[in-house]
């Protein structure tokens, strides 16, 4: 499948089955995040894999996880992220997002569905999972196979025309 078709067909899964995710597929998904581009190749991204009942229950109290069998907590280490000397911009959240996007599309290519989650308080996530100081939670990526009610959201195919996004200067 061409990438554009993969990107067009992928949707945020809101109905996961209880089927476990194979370790081989999880490894490939994590590898896609590991090799993702980062600012200055600093590689500040960190992945915390939540798959025990206890860890998944903690995540579900912090944000809606749709009963996914695996959730990857995507973080970055602030001290390892690139900081723009001109304006102080920190690349960490952007680097973590690029890694998560790579994992999301690798998952889709493997037949694994996903949903990007950010409806949580980062301080609470840091505390609940006892993250190291300087590690910043960026997002969670829920992974698994589609459940019985799996379907794209009604807004999935609604896209603005190209002219709304592109300006030639």
Where are these regions (language model features)?
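C-terminal helix-cap and adjacent tail motif
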Residues: 3-20, 139-169
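Short catalytic-loop micro-motif centered on adjacent basic/acidic residues
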Residues: 15-16, 46, 113-116
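Glycine/small-residue-rich phosphate/adenosyl-binding loop
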Residues: 25-99
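Small-aliphatic-rich amphipathic alpha-helix that forms the alpha element of a beta-alpha
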Residues: 33-34, 72, 80, 87-128, ...
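Fold-independent oxyanion-binding glycine-rich loops
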Residues: 52-53, 75-77, 120, 143-145, ...
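Short coil/turn connectors at secondary-structure junctions
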Residues: 66-70, 112, 133-137
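Short proline/glycine-enriched turn/loop segments at secondary-structure junctions
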Residues: 127-132, 153-154
């Amino acid at each position: 499948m061409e990438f554009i078709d993969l990107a067009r067909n992928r949707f945020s899964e809101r109905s996961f089955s209880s089927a476990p995710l194979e370790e081989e597929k999880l490894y490939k998904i994590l590898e896609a995040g590991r090799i993702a581009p980062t600012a200055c190749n600093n590689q500040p991204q960190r992945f915390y894999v939540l798959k025990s009942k206890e860890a998944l229950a903690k995540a579900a109290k912090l944000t809606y996880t749709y009963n996914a069998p695996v959730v990857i907590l995507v973080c970055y280490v602030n001290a390892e992220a690139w900081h723009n000397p001109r304006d102080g911009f920190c690349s960490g959240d952007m680097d973590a997002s690029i890694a998560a996007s790579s994992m999301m599309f690798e998952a889709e290519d493997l037949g694994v569905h996903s949903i990007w989650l950010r409806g949580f308080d980062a301080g609470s996530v840091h505390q609940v999972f006892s993250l190291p100081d300087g590690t910043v939670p960026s997002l969670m990526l829920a992974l698994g196979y589609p459940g019985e009610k799996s379907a794209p959201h009604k807004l999935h195919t609604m896209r603005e025309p190209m002219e709304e996004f592109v300006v030639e200067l």
